[in-house]
């Protein structure tokens, strides 16, 4: 069950309208690593968690907060689009250079959403459920969460550098702070799960069933041997085994040769040599 509080978690009010920045801000709303993605990712991970109540609550708490961030950013986008001086835009558009800049505004904001946010990226790509990860393996999922928060915070930081609007910066500063917390919480939870299950996912798969002679080899597929300069090659692997550097990649299989396709699929016939 969800309950909507009719107040934002943090203010979302720009100093002035800016339809072009509204377009840019769509990325942290409906882009691959935007707030819609992390909210849905955490929700489905939480709903699918079995027998780990403290992690389920952690996921649901964070997911619910992210829904509030969706609301904040959508509100900010709408406010960046409202009160735009249309008469001034029309006059400015008579200049071909300025007109081309104004043409960079997201037309969806005017045509589709009526000066409101859309569930899409800054380039108009619709949000997709294919962006989310919810595997049922918490260690794998929490690593995906760490990546999502890292990419998301990076994009917010870049947006912060693109504006001088104090109201926008104020909200972005809050989002940066919350992403700092979320990165830290996933790092801490990952460390806890690694102590229980080991660092390799899934930790429940029998080692005897994998070809262990290849399990810790760093294979050089490049010219030169610069990849051998990794300091960690001289240390134990995170799972306690020893790393091995292979200077030159070797082949262990045969040349792949396929049978001709059956006539009914109408493939190109094999050439005669």
UniProtKB/Swiss-Prot annotation:
Catalytic activity, as annotated: 2 H2O2 = O2 + 2 H2O
Assigned keywords, A-Z: Calcium, Manganese, Metal-binding, Oxidoreductase, Peroxidase, Stress response
Matches recorded under InterPro entries: Ferritin-like (IPR012347), Ferritin-like_SF (IPR009078), Mn_catalase (IPR007760), Mn_catalase_C (IPR027407), Mn_catalase_dom (IPR039377)
Cofactor annotation comment: Binds 1 Ca(2+) ion per subunit. Binds 2 manganese ions per subunit.
Enzyme's top EC category: oxidoreductase
S-adenosyl-L-methionine found in the keyword field: no
Residues involved in Ca(2+) binding: 57, 61, 220, 222, 224
EC number: 1.11.1.6
GO MF annotation terms: catalase activity; metal ion binding
Entry similarity comment: Belongs to the manganese catalase family.
Protein name: Manganese catalase
